[in-house]
Regions:
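Charged DNA-binding/catalytic regions of mobile-element recombinases
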Residues: 1-158
Length: 158
């Protein structure tokens, strides 16, 4: 059975927790946050940023982590009129696009660097997500970058 890659980022003294809001169609990372706690606050901040900067989705899919089932998180989605979808418990394949981003991030960035602290991890991950969105082509997108594919879709939809 496939196992989730977990969005835990190793640092010299412990772990940081990563959340990313990803557009499934284009694979574009719309917003992300890194935190030293699993509280829902950093997830809510990433969600609010994505909703402020990009068109509202019809459906929002997450796993059943406590930060995503928290009232603080789900109330933002409900307040925006977004349908909440959650993966089956322990079914990482239900959220395959997010799992793929975690795998790419870990093998192309995180495992290649030893972050001393949260600031260093945040800088490295920020550079990687810029690369991922703007430079790294995806076979499933016809070898376009997520950003180019997203913007192409947005242009034709307008």
């Amino acid at each position: 059975m496939p196992r989730p890659t977990h969005p835990y980022i190793p640092m010299a003294h412990g772990f940081a927790y990563l959340v990313a809001i990803i557009d499934w169609y284009s694979r574009r990372v719309l917003a992300w946050r890194l935190s030293n706690t699993m509280e829902s606050t950093f997830c809510v901040e990433a969600l609010q940023e994505a909703l402020a900067r990009f068109p509202k989705p019809t459906i929002f899919n997450t796993d059943q982590g406590s930060q995503f089932t928290a009232e603080a998180f789900t109330s933002v989605l409900r307040g925006a009129g977004i349908t909440i979808s959650m993966d089956g418990r322990g079914r990482c394949i239900d959220n395959v696009f997010v799992e793929r981003v975690w795998r790419s991030l870990k093998y192309e960035e995180v495992f290649l660097h030893a972050y001393e602290d949260l600031d260093e991890a945040r800088a490295g991950i920020g550079r990687y997500f810029d690369f991922y969105n703007l430079v790294r082509p995806h076979q499933a997108l016809g070898y376009q970058t997520p950003d180019a594919f997203y913007r192409g879709v947005a242009l034709t939809a307008a």
